Amino acid sequence: MANSVFAKLLGQGDYLEYPAADGTSIEPGMGLERIQEGGETRVQPVSTAGAESTLIAREQRNPPRSSTGNPLDQEYNPGDNVESRGFTQHEEARLRLAAGADLATASNATVAEGDELGWYSDGTLAKNQGNPQYEALEAVDNSGAASGDHAVITVKQQE
């Protein structure tokens, strides 16, 4: 299994750090939004379906969160510094696909190569979310997944 969110980068791969908002759990590969909390800028998973965010939580590398296990499986907790990066055209990334049990229509977590994907209201991607921004580069079926069991899917931004 791959161990990095970004599959194809343009440029240096510079990143930004923001503390994770209170009450949030952030998985590498989730879409993020910036909020103001306690007088500082923090991040949380995208909270509106169809949002236009291109800020992505990447796996923590500086320093790594753990010397064992896949960095994509090591989530950020409230207050942790989240390494994030803008996702630009012509790049490819491994982002989180919604679990079927979390969606009103579980089949929106069944993705074929070439399908258009948009943000769901929990920072994951799904079909039919309005305002699709990404194109699936592989087929993944996460329709039978339990709540919170987010798959990883390789995508690129739509042109």
Residue ranges of model-derived segments:
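Surface-exposed, low-hydrophobicity beta-strand/loop segments enriched in small/polar/acidic residues
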Residues: 1-159
